[in-house]
From Swiss-Prot:
Organism lineage: Bacteria, Bacillati, Bacillota, Bacilli, Bacillales
Keyword list, A-Z: 4Fe-4S, GTP-binding, Iron, Iron-sulfur, Lyase, Metal-binding, Molybdenum cofactor biosynthesis, Nucleotide-binding, S-adenosyl-L-methionine
InterPro entries (UniProt xref): Aldolase_TIM, Elp3/MiaA/NifB-like_rSAM, MoaA, MoaA_NifB_PqqE_Fe-S-bd_CS, MoaA_twitch, MoCo_biosynth_MoaA/MoaC, rSAM
The protein's name: GTP 3',8-cyclase
Organism of this sequence: Listeria welshimeri serovar 6b (strain ATCC 35897 / DSM 20650 / CCUG 15529 / CIP 8149 / NCTC 11857 / SLCC 5334 / V8)
Pathway annotation: Cofactor biosynthesis; molybdopterin biosynthesis
Length: 333
């Protein structure tokens, strides 16, 4: 098998597929509150295009898929997309990232279709604040979604917490306590200068050393734990006596570019080899032309930088506010 390897020796076996750029929320770090223009439906990859693409990609070593958005559960055919991917025997793991507003309703069908596990965005445990950060989200719906995911066996459940200075950094302790009684993995993620967030990221950025300082301040003893299924770049820890774990993902202050094994496919059919690099290849016209398609995929990988620009900003102490041109919801979270 010919593997998808870049010039730095990194083998790519994981792809994140955005199935829509639309979302029912407007999280402050992801999308502006208004003035948005979304892709017309005919510009969005169809279920058959996604499945056909993956039937080819597995022949080159891709074996893990994460479905993202926008909010992927807005797709009326999301269960059929999962079912189509689940029918490809070479795919070992299918996961989804969701805001969980519709997860309680769809978790069972998704599990039956072949979904392996779920990541849930949850940036506050206080209902009013959660509603403010998401501009309309209902915390109880997320909690119901978590419970349903547990019931149907989507495991491990991971909660993604974007740490925002002055908005939710006083909840670190609450999130840590959340792991004591629940077998979940809470992942604290640095605020990144992507798209809409790029205009204000310096003011809202908080280094993740804050997490460990919070543990020390309240006397929580913690230890590193072995890899969690699908843990990716997260460094994981467990508070003594806790059922669950917590992790830190620091793409800004301590990048993990040297071990990056992922590609991204946008909802409109562009391959991106690096989240923070604007270069991308339009592969949609060649979905049914495997030779040409794989040439474009390999070209994107060949052009992949050794490190992303966020790392360079900190190394050079520039920390400019220049964002990428696509919003996170357009790239795929």
């Amino acid at each position: 098998m010919q593997l998808l390897k870049d010039k730095f020796g990194r083998v790519h076996d994981y792809i994140r597929i955005s199935v829509t750029d639309r979302c029912n929320l407007r999280c402050v770090y992801c999308m502006p509150e208004e003035g948005l223009t979304f892709l017309p439906h005919e510009k969005v990859l169809s279920k058959d295009e996604i499945v056909s693409f993956m039937e080819l990609m597995v022949q080159f070593g891709i074996k893990k898929v994460r479905i993202t958005g926008g909010e992927p559960l807005l797709r009326t055919d999301i269960v059929e997309i999962v079912r189509g991917l689940g029918a490809i025997p070479e795919i070992e793991d299918i996961s989804i990232t969701t805001n969980a507003m519709y997860l309680a309703k769809k978790a069972e069908a998704l599990k039956e279709a072949g979904l392996t596990r779920v990541n849930i965005s949850l940036d506050s445990l206080h209902a009013d604040r959660f509603q403010a950060i998401t501009r309309g989200g209902r915390l109880q719906k997320v909690l119901d979604g978590i419970q349903k995911a547990e019931e149907v066996g989507l495991f491990p459940i991971k909660l993604n917490v974007v740490l925002i200075k002055g908005q939710n950094d006083d909840e670190i302790t609450d999130f840590l306590k959340f792991t004591k009684d629940k077998d979940i993995n809470i992942r604290f993620i640095e605020y990144m200068p992507i798209g809409h967030a790029g205009t204000s990221w310096k003011e809202k950025y908080l280094p993740l050393d804050t997490i460990f300082e919070a543990c020390d301040a309240i006397g929580f003893e913690y230890e590193a734990v072995d890899s969690i299924r699908g843990n990716g770049p997260s460094e994981n820890f467990r508070i003594k006596g806790a059922k669950g774990t917590f992790g830190v993902i620091h793409p800004v202050s301590s990048h993990f570019c040297d071990s990056c094994n992922r590609l991204r496919l946008t909802a409109d059919g562009y391959i991106k080899a690096c989240l923070y690099w604007d270069e991308e290849m339009n592969i949609r016209p060649f979905i049914h032309e495997p030779v040409k398609l794989m040439q474009l995929v390999q070209k994107a990988i060949d052009n992949k930088p050794e490190n992303h620009e966020m790392a360079l900003k900190l190394q050079d102490e520039v920390q400019s506010n220049k964002p990428t041109w696509r919003r996170m919801s357009q790239i795929g979270g």
